Amino acid sequence: MHLTGLFLYPVKSFRGCAVATAAIDALGLVGDRRFLVVDENGAHLTQRPLPRMALISTELTATALLLRADGAGEISVPLRATAPAPLRTVSIWRSHGLVAEDCGRAVSAWLSAFLGVPCHLVRIGEKFRRPVLDRPAFAAAGTHAPVVDDRVVSSDLFNFADGYPFLVVSEASLAHLNDRLVSIGEEPVPMDRFRPSLVVSGCPAFAEDTWSRVRIGAITFRSGGPCARCSVTTTDQFSGERGHEPLRTLATYRRDPTDPTRIHFALNLTHETKSGTLRVGDAVEWL
């Protein structure tokens, strides 16, 4: 097995970018989801209620985050504060009281105008700390293999992702789904619908469901359980248009047998190796 795709999402819910190599630090991939859009109360905003977020592209330079959107032009945001930045208390799902740096009025106005809602961009700074939280055990969809989060430790930290710093999926799993879609007259969907960090090849479809630990290159990961999917998978990541697929088809065969409200595709991961580098082409080994 090999790593065939490596993706960064500099701002949560904005368009991601493929990279050939990426460094790893305590929070995950360097440059991945270090920025977040929040409302006036500090609650995170995502494509779920705001599919227009998919229309904003991201680019990282050595010193700045560049945001672009058709009709709105481009705006640049420093990766690090050049002076003490105002702090905002923000929340993401079960993570409350997170301290982040406000990125300023200019980008707030730019985003608010484009998205049509008052909002602010915040950045991970020195005071940010977000531990990976324990979750209940879930069965892998289509199997009864338990995936238990009983090894979460205090050093397991992460960024502004939903629940875990990494998401892995196999090319074979997407191919299996697309075969089903085509067989019922639907269009195949690209990998970007699932916003993975890591894409692997050389294993059967849904083999990742059963991985408890995996090594990619020199980096070892621990399973955080299957990823429950939402309406973001039905959102075209370039047009922002939303349909019914692939979630409707996934619901026919990828429901969690212990909780049918959860529809699984891809596997959450926590990195046990807290520094290093991942490269497309790295060997992948199930441990």
What are these regions (language model features)?
Residues 1-287:
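Metal-cofactor-dependent catalytic cores
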